[in-house]
């Protein structure tokens, strides 16, 4: 959304969401395959101040495993954009920040 006066706004536009590659990720057999297995949280974007026309986003990718034997996990991905509208994922969707091993002090969601 864009506004010059903070009173009149442009129409809403989705600029980032789970896509076909996210939804095609393999999940354990115990999961209900009729629902998406990923959600994105903390999708705040920022303009990188030391380069012209560079925006960064670090959304948390929350993976739903659905059954107790498969813990829900969350990784942070890195996205870049030149205009704040069209986003590219860095590292072929590999986590930019990954959770620690099970049982470690960094294994929790937050």
Model regions and ranges:
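Carbohydrate-active catalytic/glycan-binding domains of CAZyme proteins
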Residues: 1-110
């Amino acid at each position: 959304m864009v506004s010059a006066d903070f009173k009149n706004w442009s129409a809403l536009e989705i600029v980032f969401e789970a896509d076909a590659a996210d939804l095609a990720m393999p999940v354990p057999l115990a999961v209900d395959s009729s629902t998406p297995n990923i959600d994105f949280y903390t999708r705040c974007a920022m303009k990188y101040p030391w380069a012209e026309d560079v925006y960064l986003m670090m959304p948390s990718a929350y993976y739903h495993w659905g059954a107790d034997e498969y813990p829900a996990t969350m990784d942070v991905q890195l996205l870049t954009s030149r205009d704040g509208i069209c986003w590219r994922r860095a590292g072929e969707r590999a986590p930019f920040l990954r959770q620690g091993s099970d049982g470690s002090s960094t294994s929790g969601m937050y």
